[in-house]
Amino acid sequence: MSEHQLDTRGLLCPMPVIRTQQRVATLSPGDILEVVATDPGVLHDIPAWCRVHGHDVLETTRRDREIAVRLRVNGSSSA
């Protein structure tokens, strides 16, 4: 298992989810990805995407204007 970070600050919906999907496709099951964003839509969009694709949201935090969503990649990394 390794940890990775994806910076989507400044991107608006749907780009944070698209970039998350692209990055997850390069990771292995068990890897952790922290997505950092400024678009408040990620609070709903990334957890919804994770549910559909079988990944786990581990933590969601807010730091000033930034939102961080940590997820664990499960199953096939092609999702």
Where are these regions (language model features)?
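Core SAM-dependent methyltransferase catalytic element
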Residues: 68-77
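Residue-level signal for secondary-structure boundary sites
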Residues: 43, 77-79
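Right-handed parallel beta-helix/beta-solenoid
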Residues: 1-7
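A generic structural signal for beta-strand entry/edge sites
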Residues: 3, 64-68
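Amphipathic, hydrophobic secondary-structure cores in small proteins
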Residues: 8-61
